[in-house]
Structures are given as structure tokens and as C-alpha cells.
Amino acid sequence: MTNYREMYADTKIIVSVSGGKDSTAMCLNLIENGFSITEFTRVFCDTGWEDLTTYQYLDYLENHIGPIIRLRANVAIAPANRELVSRLENQLGFESDFIRYVIQWGKFPASPHKWCTDRLKIRPYTRYLRTLEEDYVNLVGIRAEESVKRSKYKEWEYFDTFECYTHRPLLNWTEKQVIDIHNRHNVLPNALYLNGHSRVGCYPCIMARKAEIRKISEDRISIIRELENLYDITYFKGGKIDQMRSWSMTSRGGTQFFLFDTEKPTCEKWGLCEFANGGTE
């Protein structure tokens, strides 16, 4: 069994929390290894472009893993843009640095230059870390089996940007282990997983899968459509949001429309289909 006490001796433990299953499992793993919630700090970097479900889940999660510090980029609003920002944020339901940045610069993030990660996550997180006086370690919930790229990550790695070591304690965990630790602690997963999403984060992510594009809410599509038309840009590489939504409703080849959703419900792997389309109350 890993001796985390020895591993993190004399070091402040900072856990990157996303509202996703892996970062939640990482917090539960610390608790399971004898750490109280006062012995590690949970930090969430808020892009202002999450699904409302994720914000609600973070509130729920605090009852199980302790308070979560929420960081924002606090993008400034030019006077000429205030009315537009206010209207779109009211439609969204919360303040959004993502929307403010799109309006300020007239562009969506795009691979490989994903400013959403750099401007809205890394920079606020770096500013926070540099306010700390003690030595610290950054814990990240990444698993090797998620992708070929992640399978090449090291468990320990030093980052000059953060001026600290990053530890990936779940690197060799399976998804089943992640689900099992939720169950042992009676912690529900983010409801997005139960409703067919494979990931939690920006909603939608510019790298979203076809099935995830199919599940984007009409309210979010409306905001994306307006920004696309206003700045003559596209959210997804393949075309405008309405084109991509139509494509997402087709089978392979893009010519035959689905009559039924044939994907196996993701709630089955959690054994929680009764919570699908619901929340965490």
C-alpha cells in the first residue's frame, strides 16, 4: 500500500478538482488513506463554460470532500461589450469568462491553440499557486488508459510553470477502480456521465465526440450560434453549430439519420440509471 504520508511529508497538498470522476476519486483516495479534509486543498478552475450540472455537482461534492476553492480568470469587459455580455450571461445562467474572452477577441479556442486551457485554467491556477508560501505538490487525476497520450505520462513530473511537482496518483487505475471508490464512499458521479457524456469540462468541448455534440442543450447551441454569426467563426472545425448538430444525428458516413439512440446507456456501468436525467440531490 502506498505511504502517502511519507510521500507528501512537509508539503502542502493541492488537488485539481474538475467535477469529473477521476479528480473526485483522487480526493476520496486521500480520505481513504487517512487524510482529513483539512489536510489537502481542493481547487477548481472555472472557465465559465461548464454545464450547470457540473456547478451543482461541485456544491454536492463539498459535502463529501470538503470546501472547494473556485478560481476565475476574471476577464475584463470593454464598455462597448457590456450589454452583449450581460445578455448572454443571463441566458447562460452565470458569469462566463469564456464568453467574455470570445467577445473580446472574436474567436473560439481551436486545436492546437486552446486558449481556454491556457487563459482560463493554467494562468489563474499559476497565480494562485504563487501566493503560497510553503512547498506544495499538485495532484492531478489523470489515468493512462484514457488515451495513448496519457499512457506516456509519468507519475511524477516537475513543471516550471507551477514551480512544483505534479503527482498523478491514479495513473495506473482502471475506470472500474474509479467507480468502486465512489461506491465505497456513497458518492454519486457527476450526472453528465449518467446521461451519456464521456468527459466533464467545457460544455461542449471543441474536441467533443459525435455523441456528445448530439446531446448539447438548445440553450447552449443558441449562444454558440449567435457568437458564430456575430464574428463569422465556427465552434467546431467541421462547420457551423447547426451543421454539426445535424451531422451528429446521423450514423457513420453522415447520410442516415438515427431513428433511435442506439448507444448503450453510460449509467449502466455505474449501476445508477435511476439517476439519469436527474441530479445529485
Regions found by a protein language model. Name each.
Residues 1-185:
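ATP-dependent adenylation/nucleotidyltransferase module used to activate substrates
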Residues 5, 9-10, 188-190, 195-281:
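ATP/NTP-dependent adenylation/nucleotidyl-transfer catalytic domains that generate, transfer
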